Each structure stands twice: as C-alpha cells, then as structure tokens.
From Swiss-Prot:
Coiled coil: none annotated. The keyword Secreted applies. This is NLP effector protein 14. Its main location: secreted. A motif (Conserved undecapeptide motifI I) lies at residues 1-9.
Length: 133
C-alpha cells in the first residue's frame, strides 16, 4: 500500500474539505523476490476502490505502477492509473518511521479522512480493496 496525504481537497470553489488520505494497493505474486509480478492495482477514491486485474501494460513501468491524483469534478480528487510517465516516489515503510511519527499518524484527528496504513485500518482496507474473485 502506497499512501499520500493532502491537506486540502477542493477541486471547485466553495466545495471540498480539509484533509484527504488516498492510497493505492499493488497486489504482487511474491514479495520475497527482487522483481515480483504485479497481479492487480486498486487505487482509492475516498471510501471506494477501482480495480485493474491485471493492470494494463502501458500503466506499468517495470516493477512500478503509474498513478495520478486527478480531479473528480466538481466534488473531490482521487487516485487513478495512468499511461503518463512521472516522477518516482520514495518508499518509506511503516517500520522505518520513528515512533513519534507512527504515534502521530495513529492519533491525529484528520476528520473524516482516515490514515489507511495505521494499525486499526490497514487490514480492513486490504479486505475492502481485494480485487480477486
């Protein structure tokens, strides 16, 4: 699961809200190997997911998926798969965060936006996004 925090989600004047957490789950065949096969991608859109099983080849670059943050005008933003190239984001594992950072993510009130990778949410998000029948 890759997660992003946005302080404000306001695609239209007068609409939107403070705080937005979005994430994409990349489902792989074997996390133990150097270049696992990407089986599916499930980007979040507020409380739901879209699923690509398997992802289109032009939306994958090697072992990376191409994800964009897009406006779902007029209400909000969401993550989606894209064919466009972009920048790579550093991967920071939950275990790499300091105790203070994990504690802040666990306890900060983000309103209706919830931290997808914190202990109380992680497994539920995986279950909800499960793309395989």
């Amino acid at each position: 699961m890759y997660s992003w925090y946005f302080p404000k989600d306001s695609p239209s004047t007068g609409l939107g809200h403070r705080h937005d957490w979005e994430h994409v789950i990349v489902w792989i065949d074997n996390p133990e190997i150097a270049e696992p096969k990407i089986l599916a991608v499930t980007p979040s859109a507020h409380s739901g997911y879209s699923a690509q099983v398997p992802p289109d080849a032009d939306k994958v670059e090697g072992t990376s998926v191409k994800v964009n943050y897009e406006s779902k005008w007029p209400i909000n933003h969401a993550l989606g798969s894209t064919t466009k190239g972009g920048d790579y984001q550093d991967l920071i594992m939950w275990e790499q965060l300091t105790d203070a950072a994990r504690l802040a993510l666990e306890n900060t009130d983000f309103g209706k936006a919830n931290v997808p990778m914190k202990d109380g949410n992680f497994v539920g998000k995986l279950n909800k996004a499960w793309p395989f029948d």
